[in-house]
Amino acid sequence: MGPAGSGQLTKMVNQICIAGLVEGLSEGLSFARAAGLDPLAVVDVISKGAAQSWQMDNRYKTMLEGQFEHGFAVEWMRKDLAICFAEAKRNGALLPVTNLDDEFYAEVEKMGGRRWDTSGLFARLEAKRGAL
């Protein structure tokens, strides 16, 4: 990747991207349910286009089933995001959406989801709209 530290910085980029991506997928699935659409049919269509991602391919079913006891824990994501925020403060990068995502992860922790997979963001949305 480059000089010493480049790999760690690249991991930070990855975590920033995943945090936003998982929230987007959560919002999309919650919206589909709220709109009365079949989320499985929706994913079948959108997974063939620009919205497709590893997270969609590997997490949408467990999200819809309310299964969050697997994968990369919310507490670990928040630890990683704290490292990203410290680096952003140092290098002047702006992370407004990532800051918001971190607030959402904090809410998931308050729901008892500290050890849930990061896709637990979906549970936060469903709880807020009274669907859980």
Describe each PLM feature range.
Residues S6-K128:
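Helical "substrate-binding/catalytic lid" subdomain
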